[in-house]
């Protein structure tokens, strides 16, 4: 399996890396969040820009990013606009979604960009090309807040992401039972054994918490923890998350 190196973080080896979302609505709130995150043992910060009140002003988005970078100069930043159709805060046009992500990728000030799989393939490929040209890694994602698809479908989506050029394919699904969690873990194990790229998977809500902890066993390279406000159901406090991941890593 290929390793994906972003600043001082290597995906695809050791314990799953911890990513913590920033969900501030204003620059002041984002700076405050960044100052807090600076004191926490994490690997990646995800800026959930769909929470930012001036997201439709690209110049203000870049200025906000600059302010975050002042506080977190060496921390890998994952730039994510989560669309409303995949559980995000704001509905925007496809045109704006791609313009925003391409513009920020071109700045070279982000390390990773989230690209949702279920878009026009030509747009997705263009964004991947732009990101890679500016040394930005691509987390390609899909979120199902209603259900857990069949194992074959989860495998198919992750495999498709890799085929399109994702550096880190990612899927998050909602379990209705413990069996659904096992389906996600089984699919993760199957894909990670044959994939060229590290993958990121999770089963959401309380039922799925085990999937956020067991990535090193089943083959998920990153997990999401909460420092202030969870951006998805089931996220665990980052300090507790680190403790459990370290415990499992020592035994593995």
From Swiss-Prot:
GO biological process, one term: amino acid biosynthetic process
First-level EC class: lyase
Keywords recorded for this protein, A-Z: Amino-acid biosynthesis, Aromatic amino acid biosynthesis, Lyase, Schiff base
Keyword Transit peptide in annotation: no
Enzyme Commission number(s): 4.2.1.10
Function, in words: Involved in the third step of the chorismate pathway, which leads to the biosynthesis of aromatic amino acids. Catalyzes the cis-dehydration of 3-dehydroquinate (DHQ) and introduces the first double bond of the aromatic ring to yield 3-dehydroshikimate.
Name this protein carries in UniProt: 3-dehydroquinate dehydratase
Organism: Listeria welshimeri serovar 6b (strain ATCC 35897 / DSM 20650 / CCUG 15529 / CIP 8149 / NCTC 11857 / SLCC 5334 / V8)
